From Swiss-Prot:
Database matches in Pfam families: Ribosomal_S14
Family stated for the protein in its record: Belongs to the universal ribosomal protein uS14 family.
Name of the protein: Small ribosomal subunit protein uS14
Function: Binds 16S rRNA, required for the assembly of 30S particles and may also be responsible for determining the conformation of the 16S rRNA at the A site.
Gene label: rpsN
GO molecular function: rRNA binding; structural constituent of ribosome
Protein keywords: Ribonucleoprotein, Ribosomal protein, RNA-binding, rRNA-binding
Source superkingdom: Bacteria
GO CC entries: cytoplasm; small ribosomal subunit
Organism: Maricaulis maris (strain MCS10)
Length: 101
């Protein structure tokens, strides 16, 4: 099990990213627009830099929903390989069966 503080920190980052997503996209669009004057684009870049660092989507780490493990993460199930193996062996993941040939 991962540290509770690490899990909570990641959840806080996800909430911040969701809250600032629209503003961040708007500022990025202005900064990338080549038709606007350089001063306006630079001002948008400065405003973007003033936003909280943890509001960037790249700061969010994919973690297992059950254990909080950050590595060996399967996006489709939002679980780590260990939790997925346990749940699959108990038959708790629909359609997943142990392979046999």
């Amino acid at each position: 099990m991962a540290k509770t503080s690490a899990i909570e920190r990641n959840l806080k980052r996800a909430r911040l990213a969701k809250r600032y997503a629209a503003k961040r996209e708007q500022l990025k669009a202005i900064a990338r627009n080549q038709e606007l004057p350089v001063e306006e684009r630079f001002a948008a870049q400065l405003k973007l830099a003033e936003l909280p660092r943890n509001s960037a989507v790249t700061r969010i780490r994919n973690r297992c929903e059950i254990t909080g493990r950050p590595r060996a993460f399967y996006r489709k199930f939002r679980m780590s390989r260990i939790a997925m193996r346990d749940y699959a062996s108990q038959g708790m993941i629909p359609g997943m069966v142990k392979s046999s040939w």
